A protein has these predicted regions:
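Leucine-rich, hydrophobic repeat-scaffold detector
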Residues: 161, 190-191
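Extracellular beta-strand repeat scaffolds in secreted/surface proteins
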Residues: 32-36, 76
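Short, well-ordered beta-to-alpha junction loops that form the rim of enzyme active sites
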Residues: 37-40, 47
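Conserved GTPase G-domain signal focused on the G5
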Residues: 1-16
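Extracellular beta-strand-rich solenoid/capping regions of secreted or surface-exposed proteins
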Residues: 22, 26-30, 44-73, 81-146, ...
Length: 191
């Protein structure tokens, strides 16, 4: 997946990579591996069932989320399209970010002290952010997320999270990752 790719948007290689991560996740099946190039991905679309499968449409709704399907591996930190070696992988040099900051307007905390972080968490300007950035539901322990930073989620009381046909009550939890009846593996990820 690479938002800079210019090809067929079918995921067959880096030149034809899906430009929308949610499109790649919508067609992923158990055993598939999705590679995420450097960049920021926002869950600003949702899946809709259509006669021959699912399609992903833009919406910008706070309830949209990345849904990691059962048995699917999602790896970040790749150089991606346009690089001399698009398969080069270094999660520190090629940061892949799943961000709930749908409007791209979050301001980072002023410092690492308790008060700065407390003020950041309670900042109402983030109320337009995605309620849950990533959702894993009924996936057992076969799903893997590796090499991503997850940021910008803003869960709200009595909210529902929707994605690829699944709905779960996120309530006040799960701003970064909302996990239901699953035990996915997160490797070298930051929240």
């Amino acid at each position: 997946c690479d938002g800079r790719a210019l090809g067929a948007n079918d995921g067959s290689d880096w030149a034809n990579a899906f430009t929308c991560l949610q499109s790649a996740l919508a067609v992923a099946r158990p055993g598939d591996e999705i590679r995420g190039a450097q960049g920021t991905y926002r869950p600003d679309r949702h899946g809709e069932e259509v006669p021959h499968g699912a399609r992903v449409v833009a919406s910008g709704r706070r309830t949209d989320t990345f849904v990691l399907p059962s048995g699917v591996t999602l790896r970040g930190g790749y150089a991606g399209f346009g690089a001399a070696d698009p398969d080069a992988r270094d999660i520190d040099a090629y940061k892949s970010v799943l961000s709930g900051d749908l409007a791209g307007n979050d301001i980072p905390p002023a410092g690492n002290d308790w008060q700065s972080i407390h003020d950041f968490v309670l900042d109402n300007s983030r109320a337009d952010n995605s309620q849950s950035v990533l959702t894993v539901s009924s996936a057992g322990n076969t799903s893997l997320l590796e090499g991503f930073t997850i940021t910008g989620g803003h869960a709200g009381l009595d909210s529902d999270v929707e994605g690829n046909g699944s709905t779960a009550s996120a309530a006040r939890d799960g701003a970064g990752a909302f996990i239901v009846a699953s035990s996915p593996r997160f490797v070298r990820c930051a929240f």
